[in-house]
């Protein structure tokens, strides 16, 4: 079910959003916010957070920066150093115990 919603959002971002003017009052945009929610949270939690975000995205609210908040259990491991060439796609910034803000990492331009 999550994959269906994510596919619809990606379709919207790729084909519909470029035709419309920029109107989202928040950063990241509502569609990007909902993609992160569906990627890292349960279906119902992500759906509820997305609906609330879309309802807040209007002239009656200030807008601003509103990163998605996700629950993660991070395993603490001993430091193992090895060379790897993987790129960082998301940063998880601690907020409360077990909750993190999801911040997307952008590609570095040369």
UniProtKB/Swiss-Prot annotation:
Chief subcellular location: membrane
Topology in membrane: Peripheral membrane protein
Keyword Methyltransferase annotated: no
GO cellular component annotations of the record: plasma membrane
Keywords in alphabetical order: Cell inner membrane, Cell membrane, Membrane
Compartments (UniProt record): Cell inner membrane
Entry keyword Cell membrane: yes
Family, similarity comment: Belongs to the UPF0161 family.
Role noted for this protein: Could be involved in insertion of integral membrane proteins into the membrane.
NCBIfam families: membrane protein insertion efficiency factor YidD
Protein name: Putative membrane protein insertion efficiency factor
Protein source organism: Campylobacter hominis (strain ATCC BAA-381 / DSM 21671 / CCUG 45161 / LMG 19568 / NCTC 13146 / CH001A)
Higher taxonomy: Bacteria, Pseudomonadati, Campylobacterota, Epsilonproteobacteria, Campylobacterales
């Amino acid at each position: 079910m999550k994959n269906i919603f994510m596919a619809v959002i990606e379709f919207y971002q790729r084909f519909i959003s470029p035709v419309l003017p920029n109107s989202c009052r928040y950063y990241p945009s509502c569609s990007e916010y909902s993609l992160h929610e569906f990627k890292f949270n349960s279906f119902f939690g992500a759906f509820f957070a997305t609906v609330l975000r879309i309802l807040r995205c209007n002239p009656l609210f200030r807008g601003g920066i509103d990163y998605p908040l996700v629950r993660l259990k991070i395993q603490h491991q001993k430091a193992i150093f090895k060379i790897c060439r993987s790129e960082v796609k998301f940063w998880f910034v601690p907020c409360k115990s077990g909750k993190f803000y999801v911040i997307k990492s952008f590609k570095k331009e040369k």
